[in-house]
């Protein structure tokens, strides 16, 4: 995930806040160890005691079969798509509270939304899975998801009460078979089994790739089962979807489509038979569609309806899409569905559910990462979109990664997503909060009971089939490549094969509608009701015959069997028609569009394996390659109108009520079957997309941009109206559709477009990139003349074919009349064989001529459409030229502005020079005045010594105190008036200079004082540093002395230990001697008792001698004990001294470190 940037990608990107998770009680939680450092997505893991399972890191002990060898294998430790971060302003925006029992009287407006508080809630969580509809027990199952960088693996059960106005929650105990924590997975409810596949998880298979197991939850016994299919499996992925289709009453198939793994997108389609999951030979089957495959896509939605798969929206390598793709398993092919009405914008991470005949699309994230809360409905029968009107009361916030569940009372339950939706404390306050207040979360319900009134026509069922555009076209018509671009569609689709697609014949959907309503609204199956006993093990699972048996549509709702009538060059499937079905079908039939060649031919299954490019060419080439039976056949374009076109396809058709070609049909069908057997399995197209912004946005539906009414176009020249009368034998389809390569580059055939679509497209301007080439009038006239010649040739061929057919019919009538008239003339065997051969040859020629007529007619029609497109292009170019001519001449204005700018620049330079010269003159004058003033001052100083001058000047000068000016007496007033002015100016200047000098002096003194202060501080710091260094040296010396003392103490201790050993050995020796003496003393006493007794004196002497010896030994023993005690005390003292020295050493080291740190901090 990124994920998911899901590294989207997820580089998938969290909310930025970490609110406490209060979805279950605190007693059921406990924190676990953090994830390994190489894991990017699961950055937080928790394992509760019960009810909730979190990611526990990667496990390698998984045994699974290998994936298909075509896929590239990536390490799990690669970057993942992370879910996009939610802007803070979008989290706590909440609408007004809605329906509660005490607030019903306060509501004045109708709303389809309702909010419900869910206590003990599993939410918030993002990109989880939930069952699409409730069971007969009103239960909903929720598994996995992501919240606040925690990936969940718990399984919750929500039970609805009181008409879905109240819910209760329980959890399922975690077992060994429980799926590990995952996000971005897919699930579907099938009978009494809840099927889960894929997702971004830490579990890997034996090859180190992402988990590719299928997990089945028995919703009765709550036991998990993991099938073990043999052979290749779909690669583990996230952002995909799974769905089921019941083929028979006891057979259900699981389909997996799309998804991504990091930057690799998938478009493979795999199917697994759920009915055989217990068999040892169960396996995955990889489907290869016949003609067309959607682009690699992820984060889309897929539903099952009418035994078909319907895909909407999603993210491709080129951007988001809003198209509807449909897969029909009966013919094994994909189709692009042409829809009308108010189409949703391109969106991803939205949610979809089926309600009756409607596909409901809620929320999602658009191409600008804006979160949507809009609701759209697609009528799957009329193929028309409807948008739910906006009801502001109770509407949920825009969101993505949420889930939808269809309830029994025509309501849709919306749960989870990337919004917190925490409930508030007050009981009737249904506003949401971005802070967990321990009151659970808010879930939303959408009431569809009045959907017919809110969206008129949403439930309408079409009564007739769409009118075909061209009567000469049959069920399959090749589509011409086009290079036009459409502005209103902002997403291209990856390349796909240039091929035609059939449109299914109209059929009755009444039984299918009834069954779908029963499945999605009532959801009670006969087999499901019969299950009452619990299942506690997998053996019990095997005993249940209907674990994977959903409702089976009746035969009337099944798609009719499609028969292959040709295997080259397009391998186009057709529908076997009834005898009265004479109308031919348009490529756009039943709002089901044939894929345009703008998909390109690189998505054909054969090229998918070989092509490693992430972006496939979308422009048409001059050669169209189509794989058949392992070979590539080239279809050359028609260079000349008179060149013959070989017919390669024959169709089962009617001529005057007689069916032809039954034997040839069966032969062609056998060839088609052989081709299918030789084809290899389908694989996904994978491509790395480091940045999708670099791709230019295009779209496949580009030809409809220029489709407008002919009366609204001012054509430069009217094309010739070519109409060819269809004979009774018309009704065949052409096999090939070939046009000139020169025309193929710029134009494409136009199909009938619904009125709404026409009106919308007519208002959209044509992209200028598609009309940059100017069409020459000579080429236009050439094409016109060529069309005229083709018309004449076609008419001639048609007349020849009609005449030939009439001749054959005449001969046949004559033969029948001869036979009926009872003629006795007998025809020999050789003549009959020749006649039969000639008839077959003529029939073949007739068919060939009819095919050529149809091909030429289609070519003529396409040429007319091309001319119409060219005419529109020319008209658009002329209008553009006129609009450009009417625009003002900006070049002349620019030149005038440039000239004016140059003039102003020259004037500016001149003014600058004048200003510079004026400044220089002022400076020179000031210098002259200064020199004159200096000479004047020197002269005044010389005359100052003269006393008479001073006395006379003192009598004449008076000081005016009021104005501060000096007034000079009249005798010298006239002579010194000008000098006084100069002197006053110079005096003022001198005062200013003195003031500045004083200020400079003061600042200098301040700086000098600061300098001295800093110098003193530096000297004091230097002294402190020296003192610290001396202390450090002293400490180092003490440390060295302590080390030496410790060494000496250790040496003394070693000496004492050696002496102690000596004492021990000596003590042992003395003990041995004492034992020996005791033994000898005992022997002597025994001998003395048993021997002859001597006199009492001799015995007394012996006793005295023994006692003396014993006393001596006792003294020695006591001395040794004393020495041993002293030695033990000395040893204990030495140990205490060593411990004290160690403590001192540690203290010294700590002090040294502290001093060093202080010194470093002082220096800094």
UniProtKB/Swiss-Prot annotation:
Any coiled-coil regions, as ranges: 777-931, 974-1163
Annotated positions of the Phosphothreonine modification: 467, 477, 604, 626
rRNA-binding keyword on record: no
Assembly and binders: Interacts with KEL2.
Modified residues (Phosphoserine): 20, 23, 25, 94, 503, 613, 689, 691, 717, 748, 837, 848, 958, 997, 1003, 1022
Name of the protein: Kelch repeat-containing protein 1
GO cellular component, one term: cellular bud tip
Keywords: Coiled coil, Kelch repeat, Phosphoprotein, Repeat
Upper taxonomic lineage: Eukaryota, Fungi, Dikarya, Ascomycota, Saccharomycotina
Keyword Endoplasmic reticulum: no
General remark: Present with 1350 molecules/cell in log phase SD medium.
Start-end of each Kelch repeat: 139-186, 253-307, 308-357, 359-409, 411-460
Stated role: Has a role in cell morphogenesis and cell fusion and may antagonize the PKC1 pathway.
Start and end residues of each stretch annotated as Disordered: 1-106, 550-589
Biased amino acid composition, Polar residues: 20-37, 50-68, 78-102, 554-575
Gene Ontology terms, MF aspect: identical protein binding
GO BP terms, alphabetized: cytogamy; establishment or maintenance of bipolar cell polarity; negative regulation of exit from mitosis; negative regulation of pheromone-dependent signal transduction involved in conjugation with cellular fusion; regulation of cell shape; regulation of cytokinesis; regulation of formin-nucleated actin cable assembly; regulation of vesicle-mediated transport
């Amino acid at each position: 995930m990124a994920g998911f940037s899901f590294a989207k990608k997820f580089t998938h990107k969290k909310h930025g806040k970490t609110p406490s998770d209060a979805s279950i009680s605190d007693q059921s939680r406990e924190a676990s160890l953090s994830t390994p450092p190489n894991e990017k997505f699961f950055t937080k893991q928790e394992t509760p005691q019960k009810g909730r399972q979190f990611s526990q890191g990667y496990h390698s002990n998984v045994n699974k079969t290998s994936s298909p060898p075509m896929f590239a294998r990536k390490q799990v430790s690669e970057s993942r798509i992370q879910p996009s971060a939610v802007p803070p302003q979008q989290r706590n925006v909440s609408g007004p509270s809605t329906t509660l029992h005490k607030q019903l009287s306060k509501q004045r407006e109708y709303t389809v939304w309702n909010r419900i508080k869910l206590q003990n809630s599993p939410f918030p969580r993002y990109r989880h899975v939930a069952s699409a509809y409730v069971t007969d027990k009103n239960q909903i199952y929720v598994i996995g998801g992501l919240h606040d960088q925690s990936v969940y693996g718990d399984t919750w059960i929500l039970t609805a009460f009181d008409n879905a106005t109240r819910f209760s929650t329980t959890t399922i105990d975690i077992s060994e078979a429980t799926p590990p924590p995952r996000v971005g997975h897919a699930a579907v409810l099938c009978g009494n089994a809840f099927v889960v596949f894929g997702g971004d998880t830490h579990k890997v298979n034996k090859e180190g790739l992402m988990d590719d197991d299928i997990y089945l939850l028995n919703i009765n016994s709550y036991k998990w089962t993991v099938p073990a299919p043999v052979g290749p499996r779909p690669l583990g992925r996230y952002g995909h979807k799974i769905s089921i289709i019941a083929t028979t009453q006891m057979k259900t198939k699981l389909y997996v489509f799309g998804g991504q793994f990091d930057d690799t997108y998938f478009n493979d389609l795999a199917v697994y038979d759920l009915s055989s999951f217990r068999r040892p030979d169960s396996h995955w089957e990889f489907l290869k569609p016949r003609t067309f495959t959607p682009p690699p896509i992820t984060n889309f939605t897929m539903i099952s309806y009418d035994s078909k798969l319907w895909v909407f929206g999603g993210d491709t390598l080129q951007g988001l899409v809003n198209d509807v793709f449909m897969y029909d398993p009966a013919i094994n092919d994909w189709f692009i569905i042409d829809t009308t009405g108010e189409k949703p914008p391109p969106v991803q991470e939205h949610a979809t559910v089926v309600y009756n005949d409607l596909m409901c699309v809620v929320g999602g994230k658009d191409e600008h990462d804006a979160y949507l809360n809009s609701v759209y409905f697609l009528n799957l029968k009329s193929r028309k979109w409807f948008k739910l009107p906006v009801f502001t009361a109770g509407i949920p916030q825009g969101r993505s990664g949420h889930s939808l569940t269809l309830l029994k009372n025509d309501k849709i339950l919306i749960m989870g997503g990337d919004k917190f939706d925490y409930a508030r404390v007050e009981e009737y306050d249904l506003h949401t909060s971005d802070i967990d207040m321990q009151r659970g979360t808010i879930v939303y319900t959408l009431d569809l009971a009045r959907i017919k009134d809110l969206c008129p026509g949403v439930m309408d069922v079409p009564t007739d089939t769409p009118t075909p555009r061209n009567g000469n076209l049959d069920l399959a018509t090749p589509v011409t490549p086009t290079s036009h671009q459409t502005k209103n569609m902002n997403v291209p689709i990856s390349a796909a094969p240039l091929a035609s697609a059939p449109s299914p014949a109209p059929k009755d959907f009444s039984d299918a509608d009834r069954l779908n309503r029963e499945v999605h609204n009532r959801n009670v199956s006969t087999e499901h009701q019969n299950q009452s006993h619990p299942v506690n093990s997998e053996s019990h699972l095997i005993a249940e015959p209907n674990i994977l048996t959903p409702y089976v549509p009746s035969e009337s709702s099944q798609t009719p069997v499609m028969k292959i009538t040709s295997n080259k060059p397009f391998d186009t499937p057709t529908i076997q028609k009834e005898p009265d079905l004479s109308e031919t079908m348009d490529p756009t039939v039943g709002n089901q569009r044939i894929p345009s060649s703008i998909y390109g031919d690189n998505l054909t299954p054969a090229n998918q394996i070989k092509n490693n490019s992430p972006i496939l060419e979308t422009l048409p080439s001059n050669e169209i390659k189509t794989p058949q039976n392992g070979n590539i056949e080239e279809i050359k374009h028609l260079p000349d109108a008179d060149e013959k076109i070989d017919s390669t396809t024959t169709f089962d058709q009617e001529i005057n009520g007689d069916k032809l070609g039954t034997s040839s049909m069966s032969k062609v069908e056998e060839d088609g079957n052989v081709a299918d057997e030789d084809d290899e399995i389908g694989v996904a197209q994978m491509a790395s997309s480091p940045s999708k912004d670099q791709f230019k946005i295009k779209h496949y539906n580009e030809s409809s941009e220029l489709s407008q009414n002919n009366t609204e176009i001012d054509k430069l020249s009217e094309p010739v109206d070519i109409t060819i009368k269809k004979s009774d034998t018309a009704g065949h389809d052409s096999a090939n559709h070939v046009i000139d390569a020169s025309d193929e580059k710029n134009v494409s055939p136009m199909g009938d477009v619904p009125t709404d679509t026409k009106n919308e497209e007519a208002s959209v301007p044509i992209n200028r990139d598609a009309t940059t080439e100017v069409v020459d009038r000579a080429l236009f006239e050439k094409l016109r003349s060529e069309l005229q010649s083709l018309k004449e040739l076609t008419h001639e061929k048609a007349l020849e074919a009609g005449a030939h057919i009439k001749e054959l019919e005449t001969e046949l009538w004559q033969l029948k009349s001869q036979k009926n008239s009872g003629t006795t003339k007998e025809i020999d065997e050789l003549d009959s064989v020749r006649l039969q051969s000639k008839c077959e040859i003529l029939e073949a020629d007739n068919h060939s001529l009819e095919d050529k007529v149809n091909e030429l007619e289609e070519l003529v029609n396409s040429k007319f459409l091309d001319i119409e497109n060219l005419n529109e292009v020319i008209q658009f170019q002329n209008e553009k030229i006129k609009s450009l001519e009417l625009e003002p001449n900006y070049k002349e204005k620019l030149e005038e502005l440039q000239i004016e700018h140059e003039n102003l620049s020259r004037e500016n330079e001149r003014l600058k020079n004048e200003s510079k010269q004026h400044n220089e003159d002022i400076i020179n004058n000031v210098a002259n005045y200064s020199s004159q003033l200096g000479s004047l001052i020197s002269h005044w100083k010389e005359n100052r010594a003269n006393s008479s001058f001073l006395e006379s000047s003192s009598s004449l000068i008076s000081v005016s105190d009021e104005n501060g000016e000096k007034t000079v007496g009249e005798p010298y007033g006239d002579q010194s008036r000008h000098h006084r002015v100069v002197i006053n100016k110079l005096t003022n200047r001198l005062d200013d200079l003195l003031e500045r000098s004083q200020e400079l002096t003061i600042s200098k003194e301040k700086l000098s004082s600061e300098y001295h202060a800093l110098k003193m501080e530096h000297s004091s710091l230097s002294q402190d540093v020296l003192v610290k260094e001396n202390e450090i040296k002293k400490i180092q010396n003490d440390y060295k002395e302590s080390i030496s003392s410790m060494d000496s103490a250790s040496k003394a201790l070693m000496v004492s230990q050696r002496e102690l050993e000596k004492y021990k050995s000596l003590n042992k020796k003395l003990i041995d001697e004492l034992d020996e003496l005791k033994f000898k003393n005992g022997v002597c006493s025994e001998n003395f008792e048993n021997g002859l007794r001597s006199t009492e004196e001799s015995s007394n002497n012996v006793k005295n001698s023994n006692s003396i010896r014993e006393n001596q030994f006792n003294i020695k023993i006591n001395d040794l004990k004393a020495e041993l005690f002293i030695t033990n005390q000395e040893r204990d003292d030495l140990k205490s001294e060593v411990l004290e020295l160690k403590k001192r050493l540690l203290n010294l080291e700590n002090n040294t470190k502290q001093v060093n740190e202080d010194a470093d901090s002082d220096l800094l």
